[in-house]
Amino acid sequence: MVLASSTTSIHTMLLLLLMLFHLGLQASISGRDTHRLTRTLNCSSIVKEIIGKLPEPELKTDDEGPSLRNKSFRRVNLSKFVESQGEVDPEDRYVIKSNLQKLNCCLPTSANDSALPGVFIRDLDDFRKKLRFYMVHLNDLETVLTSRPPQPASGSVSPNRGTVEC
């Protein structure tokens, strides 16, 4: 009889603990906690900051102008600019790499992005001219709400410092 009573009380305790943890996992996140998990990106400000760091000369040739203006090519062109930035300006002289990466969160994805050719960059001067032209035509970007990547514990080193998550 004593054995059955102690087994029942153990089962009752385990059941109560299970219910308690289950309810805790289902609890809604308060507004204060949501703020820690999200941030806003003012996309038009990022574009203006990039434009301000680039020299004045605009793109003179019209051969790539239409593809740089085309809204369907926005994301694939941005990817090409991020990729080319590391090649033509590895020291990031204009300090625009992180802003280019942040803009990924501002542009919608499309199913055929990988099939599109994107912009062709020859050298640093070509990169600056085309990037400025491209940025000037990103005039309709809005502020977006993005999720923050998990913060590393104090004293730990984050392995992906250069990446930006949306």
Curated annotation (Swiss-Prot):
GO terms for molecular function: cytokine activity; growth factor activity; interleukin-3 receptor binding. Coiled coil: none annotated. Residues 1-26 form the signal peptide. SUPFAM superfamilies: 4-helical cytokines (SSF47266). Glycans are attached at N42, N112. Gene3D superfamilies: 1.20.1250.10. Disulfide bonds join C43-C106, C105-C166. Disruption phenotype: IL-3-deficient animals show no abnormalities. Analysis of steady-state hematopoiesis demonstrates normal numbers of peripheral blood cells, bone marrow and splenic hematopoietic progenitors. However, they show impaired contact hypersensitivity reactions. InterPro entries: 4_helix_cytokine-like_core (IPR009079), IL-3 (IPR002183). It is found in: Secreted. Keywords: Cytokine, Disulfide bond, Glycoprotein, Growth factor, Secreted, Signal. It comes from the Eukaryota. GO terms for cellular component: extracellular space. Activated T-cells, mast cells, natural killer cells. One of its GO terms (biological process) is positive regulation of cell population proliferation. Residues 145-166 are annotated as: Disordered. Monomer. Cytokine secreted predominantly by activated T-lymphocytes as well as mast cells and osteoblastic cells that controls the production and differentiation of hematopoietic progenitor cells into lineage-restricted cells. Also stimulates mature basophils, eosinophils, and monocytes to become functionally activated. In addition, plays an important role in neural cell proliferation and survival. Participates as well in bone homeostasis and inhibits osteoclast differentiation by preventing NF-kappa-B nuclear translocation and activation. Belongs to the IL-3 family. This is Interleukin-3.
